[in-house]
Amino acid sequence: MQIGAATEGVEADLSVNAEPDVKPIAKMLSACVGSVITTLTVTPLDVVKTRLQSESISQYSSTQPISSAKILGKGRPAPKPLGGPVSGLYQIARHEGVRSLWRGLVPSLTMLLPANTVQFLGYEQLLPLYSDWGFPAAAAIAGASARTISATIVSPIELFRTRVQAVGGHYPPGHAREIANEVFDGLKLMIHQKGILNLWSGVSVTLWRDVPFSAFYWWSYERIRLFLLGHPSLQAFSSSQSTKDLYINFVSGGISGTLATLLTQPFDVSKTAKQVHGHTLTRGQFMLTLWKRGGPKALWKGTLPRCVKVAPSCAIMISSYHLTKKYFSESVDAY
């Protein structure tokens, strides 16, 4: 096939072929290690991003978040608006406690461990298949396919995590149990009124954000990686191939994650609106309403904290995954 011939040279250097293959259990453990490191690092940035978006949506909406309605009804004051991503970290740490920056850590881990495992294993299984079939942009198609599966699996967990982070500012420090109970009560009421399938209420918006994100991320990651592999300055960077690989994966993941974030930010804002406020509006109606009331700025609210979160998240995840997988490949007798 002509397409396959045109892409053969490129596909031969894809990341999935750059290191010895390991058994699925080693890949799963590698994905889990990367997920834990990434989550511990970027959860504070995710808390700030969710709070900023929730505040913006409340500003342009006449309704309160579902899971915080009863809280505010009890007379609890709304949290002071955050000034921005950097000052937001300081404000939350000062007024709600440093531990509040890791609010939603457990559901984040519960969500990311299976999500990243499915994502990375799925990508590595599908990429050679699509490449053999001669698909153009095989990396984009493989990334989008793997992300569709993983996002659907973890959507209810992400819904819970998003609401925990959004309403946490209505409680003083040290009330994690009360926050979780309040969110659980809101979810139970939602299931009773609208059915259990509403736990996937944000999955369509999540897919609209994550599928294009993953497609562009994996496509650009493979291309940036190939560019860095052939760059002359890299040859003088380090004599160790492991160090070079770590650098290439880290930089490629960070740049690709940033570019993909800029493209998909409006979908992230509409996803947060859907999960936090529980509107019956469609994705398009959400985005149109925000555009009319706040302009383009409303649709790209939280772009900086999301970029600050996603760039290191992608860089850490992809580099730690390949580094851990390389370790397992050198310890093949144990696996």
Swiss-Prot record:
UniProt-annotated location(s): Mitochondrion inner membrane
An example Gene Ontology biological process: import into the mitochondrion
Principal subcellular localization: mitochondrion
Gene3D superfamilies: Mitochondrial carrier domain
Pfam families assigned to the protein according to its UniProt record, in alphabetical order: Mito_carr (PF00153)
GO cellular component: mitochondrial inner membrane; mitochondrion
InterPro entries: Mitochondrial_sb/sol_carrier, Mt_carrier_dom_sf, Mtm1-like
Any GO MF annotation of the entry: glutathione transmembrane transporter activity
Chain ranges passing through the membrane: 28-48, 104-123, 133-154, 195-219, 246-263, 307-323
Family recorded in the similarity comment: Belongs to the mitochondrial carrier (TC 2.A.29) family.
Protein name: Uncharacterized mitochondrial carrier P23A10.06
Gene source species: Schizosaccharomyces pombe (strain 972 / ATCC 24843)
